[in-house]
């Protein structure tokens, strides 16, 4: 129902703000010498677009853009930034997974695909999808309660990779 969806959203937002009091968050603050009173936080709600396969929902693609490129290659410049793209949810990128990385000013200059050996070793092999079996269950502070980490071969088997199709929002 609409009311239960609103409550789940409200609980999720409260959970994000409460996370600053978690042990890991406090340890991070201490390790980085950050002061909690000077920290800022925001919650961004984004529509997830992709396709459903049984009890799994495959987000089409995720990306993280950074304004600085700390490791420019060739004629790239630090101020041109970088983009990391991945199949599935952005958690894979944020968690440090192997993703496609490039400078938006040099989109055809991708080190990871320059040689077959590098491509096989340094490209994405896993990704996150939404596990719809937990849809509608009570909110959990565990950020993985409704996620599955799958091998890219699963997406290929389900038909998510290799053919064009219409995306539907979740």
State what each model feature region is.
Residues 1-4, 168-169:
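Short, small-residue-biased leader/transition segments that mark boundaries at the very start
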Residues 6-73:
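Extended, Lys/Arg-enriched charged tracts that mediate electrostatic binding to polyanionic substrates
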Residues 17, 25-28, 75-170:
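Conserved catalytic alpha/beta cores of large enzymes that bind or transform nucleotide phosphates
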């Amino acid at each position: 129902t609409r009311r239960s969806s609103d409550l789940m959203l409200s609980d999720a937002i409260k959970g994000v703000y409460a996370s600053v009091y978690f042990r890991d968050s406090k340890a991070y603050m201490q390790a980085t010498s950050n002061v909690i009173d000077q920290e800022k936080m925001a919650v961004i709600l984004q529509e997830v677009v992709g396709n459903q396969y049984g009890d799994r929902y495959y987000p089409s693609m995720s990306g993280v853009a950074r304004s600085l490129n700390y490791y420019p290659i060739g004629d790239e410049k630090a101020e041109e930034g970088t983009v990391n793209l991945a199949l599935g949810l952005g958690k894979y990128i944020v968690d440090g997974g192997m993703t496609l990385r490039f400078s938006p000013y040099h989109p055809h200059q991708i080190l990871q695909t320059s040689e077959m050996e590098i491509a096989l070793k340094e490209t994405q092999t896993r990704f996150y999808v939404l596990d719809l079996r937990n849809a509608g269950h009570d909110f959990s502070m565990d950020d993985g309660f409704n996620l599955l980490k799958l091998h890219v071969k699963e997406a290929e088997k389900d038909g998510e990779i290799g053919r064009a199709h219409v995306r539907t929002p979740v």
